[in-house]
UniProtKB/Swiss-Prot annotation:
Family the UniProt entry places it in: Belongs to the universal ribosomal protein uL22 family.
Disulfide-bond pairs as recorded: none
Pfam family, one: Ribosomal_L22
Xref: PANTHER family: CHLOROPLAST 50S RIBOSOMAL PROTEIN L22-RELATED, LARGE RIBOSOMAL SUBUNIT PROTEIN UL22M
Lineage summary: Bacteria, Pseudomonadati, Thermodesulfobacteriota, Desulfuromonadia, Geobacterales
Organism from which the protein derives: Geotalea uraniireducens (strain Rf4)
Name of this protein: Large ribosomal subunit protein uL22
GO CC annotations on file: cytosolic large ribosomal subunit
GO molecular function: rRNA binding; structural constituent of ribosome
Length: 111
């Protein structure tokens, strides 16, 4: 049985978040959460929260053994980019891009 969780419009760069997501793909739940706990990247906290949510969804569905869950699929897609302008010298303005990410995780039971 599979369970999933999604996080939309996270104020994280998709490129930097993919580095964190690649560390936990295919790992067991406890191993993945421990890896994220000791990761210095800011996106690791949100990804671990998302994994915990997916585990809670699995418990709600009635998965027999939560300890047998592993990260089957996890991916990051780019969301909309918030564009802001900051005033510069001589009446100019510079563009500031604030990227967002959509993160999706699917957990499955080991056979």
């Amino acid at each position: 049985m599979e369970s999933s969780a999604k996080l939309s419009f996270a104020r994280l760069s998709p490129r930097k978040t993919r580095l964190v997501v690649d560390m936990v793909r295919g790992k067991g739940i406890q191993n993945a959460l421990n890896t994220l706990r000791f990761s210095p990247q800011p996106s690791a906290k949100l990804v671990s929260k998302l994994l915990s949510s997916a585990v809670a969804n699995a418990e709600q569905k009635g998965v027999a053994d939560v300890d047998r869950l592993y990260v089957k699929t996890i991916y990051v897609n780019g969301g909309t980019v918030l564009k802001r302008f900051v005033p510069r010298a001589m009446g100019r303005a510079s563009k500031i891009r604030k990227p967002t990410s959509h993160i999706c995780v699917v957990l499955a039971e080991k056979k």
